[in-house]
Amino acid sequence: MALPFLPGNSFNRNIGKERFHKSQHWGFCNNVRMLVSENKPGVGGDLLYGQKIKPKHSVFPKGDGTDAPSWVAFDKQVLSFDAYLEDEISDKRQEIFRIRYYKIYFYLEDDTIQVNEPEVINSGLPQGTSIRRQRIPYPPPNDDQFYTVYDFNINISVVFYGRTFKIYDCDPFTKNFLKKIGIKLNPPGQCPLDPYMKMRRETLEFVDPFRPYQSFDTLKRFIQYDGKVLRFFCLWDDSTSLFGDRREFVLHYFLCDGTVEIREVLPSNSGRDAMSSFLRRGKLPKYGPPGIYQPGQITDRAVLNVYGGLSEWRADGYLLDKYQLGKVEQDFYTDQDLSIGATINVWGRKVLLCDCDEFTKTYYRTKYGVDNFTPISCKPPHLPKIERKYPPYTGFGSEEDSFRSCVGLKPTPHRKNFKKFMELDSFGNISNILRYFGKLITHKCADVDRIFVIAFYLSDDTISVFEPIENNSGNAGGMFLKRSRVKKPGQEVFKSEFSEYIKAEELYIGATVNINGYLFILLNADEYTLNYMENNTDKFPYSNFELAIQKLKQEKSKSREITQVFAAADYNHTKVVPYNTFRDILMSITMGKLIDQELITIARHYRVPEIMDPDLAYLIARAHEKFKKNIFENFDMFIYNCVYEDREKKGVLPTKDIRRMCKSSRLPLDDDFLDCLLSRFEDKDHQINYEIFFSVLNWRMNPTPDLQAPPYLKEKCEDVWVGMPSPIPVKYVRYLDFLIDVYGLEDNML
């Protein structure tokens, strides 16, 4: 019973609609009025009464996420079904029907179907694509509709253009997809065997194939190994024959066809023709030379007889020998026969494989699992060197001159080491001269205090000795030994071998050197020499800081005693001690294990840097002297400019700004002197208090005493070099850092 049409009982069914137009059902076709489409809806897109629209494509259930079109969501997704077809065979006694196997591909993106028939060897049937990709309609009377994904399942039959295909299975992807869209899958079916193909297979199992049907396919090997060559370095030792020698070869084995090529490595000035090819490319027999074969004896197939051919084909032919009687079997070298250490027969010549390249090693390691590639030397064993004996030194000239006179008929001068001279000769500020200060070891009281400068020239290993001149010493001083090489003592004078000379490695602080019978003990060295020795620790091991520290670490059991001794020596708690105190403590603790060179190396590492800057009062006095000479008094202008530049009113300006003002106002000071003066007034932020700076420079307001020239002769002290060596290499040593690095002691333990 329907409700009465009263307010509150009726509902507006047009709420939410946006389309209210009528569909155009009628039109013209070839100027004839007719119904254009029966599938068009009514007003607003609603279906007419009793109207059912058939879906044109597969309708998939909606899921979560974005609604992408089917041609995007199912791109490159294909359902694969296995099917077969019973094809009737007429007018043939061997078979009544034949089972043909097919692959049905359903493309989800546009509901197209493709049917392919896999290839069967020697089937005699057209195979490949049976139905090209297209939308396939239902069989009549529903041929106005097309197959969709819901029409496929396992163990069903589908009709494509009158041919019935029975689907018996599908791939796992197809099964999962059909389950997801709600299709209940049938159990897989069994595909029947083709009776004719089964009969042929059983027949072929009992057939003895003829040899002419053997395959000689070399294309696969050629494509796989083309351009890949095994290379071995080999040796043919022919030294046992008359005028024979050892000859080196390079063997190339071509993997694409198993051929071998050998090329000879010709050394320079060998006397042989410049023909590197020793064996042209070809297969190498293992047992050669085999002899001379008759024409046609070496063939791939043996021809039994020639016949005229079949009458219907009108073509000539030949019969091949099935049993190949009398065929010559040849055994050639393959890659399995080649290895390092193997000896191969190259047409009667024994060739030893000594080594191979990296590609060959990788090939054998990958294919055969070979890991031993120990090479064999191709070089001949070294002949014992005949030592040439020379007559002894005559005593005239140098040993090198006597040697050169014995080498040839015409005496030639000795060739010096020019490369060493060019590398180690002095240039610029680099002198390449090691200078040591030493004393003469003698029992004469007058010569005990004599100091000498021993210079070693690295360019030619020569030594010169110079004695500084001292007033009222009783010694003339000057050159003690001119520059020359010094022989080591204890050598025979007249001998055939060269004498040994003093080298740079034998000179270090604390060493005793015998120079032509005079014994010198090296006491100290200049700064360049110490730096050179520390930079070349491979030649001067006593200047190696790590080795010296390692000796002290061996005395770790005495660390507490060493700490107490240093603490007692540093009674002012300055954490530094003089060098002599540092040396005496270490020498007493190590009991002579360290030499002076090692002590100096350690002391230089922990030394207190000396400030070499000139006195500020001296700099101001020099600046006032220059201002007086140039009558420069305009210092108030500098302060006014600085106040103008100081926008933040801090009273300080950057150093570069004050330097720019000084240069722009032509302050009569040199660049280096001005930089030195500015550095003495700048703070850690590189800023200068301009009022203090220019007030100090104002020689009118703040005069200083006149600058006095230093005396010509200055009293000798430890810090000034006047021709005599300084008695100590460094002034103070930071012993606290030394104890922390060597023994791991902390500051609070002292």
UniProtKB/Swiss-Prot annotation:
SUPFAM superfamilies: EF-hand. It holds the Pfam family DM10_dom. GO terms for biological process: cellular response to leukemia inhibitory factor; flagellated sperm motility. PROSITE patterns: DM10. Microtubule inner protein component of sperm flagellar doublet microtubules. The keyword Cytoplasm applies. Keywords: Cell projection, Cilium, Cytoplasm, Cytoskeleton, Flagellum, Repeat. Microtubule inner protein (MIP) part of the dynein-decorated doublet microtubules (DMTs) in cilia axoneme, which is required for motile cilia beating. It is found in: Cytoplasm, Cytoskeleton, Cilium axoneme; Cytoplasm, Cytoskeleton, Flagellum axoneme. GO terms for cellular component: axonemal A tubule inner sheath; axonemal microtubule; ciliary basal body; sperm flagellum. This is EF-hand domain-containing family member C2. Residues 75-182, 226-368, 430-537 form the DM10 domain. Residues 557-592 form the EF-hand domain.
